[in-house]
């Protein structure tokens, strides 16, 4: 599962991280900046949106449920009454590829810039979960394919914003998970993405999170250093007490909260570091595309990192192959 002692050591450090250094007090005034946070109606997405808004940013609260999103917006506004920023609901359903373009068009009808796309939304689907609208396994279809399509459709705006913005400030953040450590050797099997050979619910979730990492690596290669200047980085937000764990028993939840789980704001700090810290550059993420909690440079499992790298760098080229596969899946919806 972990492959080597170094991988185990890295995973252990991400389960029990040091206190965060990069928090609300670390970021400047964000007036004039525009952000999208998917899954912003609850958990770390809601916490992140609150931090950005408190610094006068305009934040698009992207979520499926308008009622839940509006409740989150009202909560955040009440918590930060002096903000000069804005919170705007953006309807999005990542489990339906046919609906994503209309969400992007709704955003583009209001904005000409996008400073950071926080791909925060995700599901942790049980084994008997229904498939997506297009028939994909729910974790893969929502967390990976839907998120990829959203990013692809917003990429021209990100690239255009980067032309007139400070170096390395325009970014795409991919929220992965420590669950990648439960994936198979190399991260994922390109020949079994339809799951004709069934896998456990944990493995399916892990594969979807490996997919986020692979997409981040390939976007960084195509549009980062020596290209268009968009920083793309994946992260493990940390072990958090969020709605993703709503299907756990009360006993499991109590034990995890006591020993392992942290409040969602800590995960928001991980995303905040990835999205705004000047320590992160397009050059840096070409070599190491993984941020751990609560804003630390870490390493993903060695065999996944090796598989993702281009063949020209001694890797297996999996990031490029998975990118091309995903492009084929979303082609009818672009």
Swiss-Prot record:
InterPro entries: NAD(P)-bd_dom_sf, SDR_fam. GO terms for molecular function: oxidoreductase activity. The gene is fc-sdr. Belongs to the short-chain dehydrogenases/reductases (SDR) family. This is Short-chain dehydrogenase/reductase. It comes from Phomopsis amygdali (Fusicoccum amygdali). NADP(+) binds at residues 44, 68, 93, 120, 152, 205, 209, 239. It is an enzyme of class 1 (oxidoreductase). It holds the Pfam family adh_short.
């Amino acid at each position: 599962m972990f492959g080597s002692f170094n991988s185990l050591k890295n995973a252990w450090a991400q389960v029990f991280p040091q206190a965060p250094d990069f928090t609300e007090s670390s970021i400047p005034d964000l007036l004039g900046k525009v952000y999208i946070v998917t899954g912003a109606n609850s958990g770390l997405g809601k916490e992140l949106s609150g931090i950005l808004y408190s610094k006068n940013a305009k934040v698009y609260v992207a979520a499926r449920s308008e009622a839940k999103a509006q409740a989150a917006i009202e909560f955040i506004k009440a918590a930060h009454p002096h903000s000069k920023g804005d919170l705007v609901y953006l309807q999005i359903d990542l489990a339906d590829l046919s609906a994503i373009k209309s969400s992007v068009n709704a955003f583009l009808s209001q904005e000409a810039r996008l400073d950071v796309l926080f791909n925060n939304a995700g599901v942790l689907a049980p084994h008997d979960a229904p498939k997506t609208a297009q028939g994909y396994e729910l974790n893969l279809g929502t967390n990976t394919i839907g998120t990829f399509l959203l990013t692809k459709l917003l990429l021209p705006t990100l690239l255009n914003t980067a032309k007139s913005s400070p170096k390395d400030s325009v970014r795409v953040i991919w929220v992965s998970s420590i669950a990648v450590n439960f994936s198979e050797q190399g991260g994922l099997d390109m020949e079994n993405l339809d799951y004709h050979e069934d896998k456990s619910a944990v493995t399916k979730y892990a594969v979807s999170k490996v997919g986020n990492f692979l997409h981040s690596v390939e976007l960084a290669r195509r549009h980062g250093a020596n290209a268009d200047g968009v920083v793309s980085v994946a992260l493990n937000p940390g072990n958090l007490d969020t709605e993703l764990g709503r299907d756990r028993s009360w006993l499991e939840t109590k034990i995890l909260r006591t020993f392992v789980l942290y409040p969602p704001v800590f995960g928001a700090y991980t995303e905040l570091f990835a999205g705004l810290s000047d320590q992160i550059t397009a050059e840096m993420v070409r070599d190491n595309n993984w941020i751990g909690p609560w804003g630390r440079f870490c390493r993903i499992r060695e065999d996944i990192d090796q598989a993702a790298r281009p063949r020209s760098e001694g890797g297996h080229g999996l990031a490029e192959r998975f990118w091309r596969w995903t492009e084929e899946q979303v082609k009818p919806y672009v």
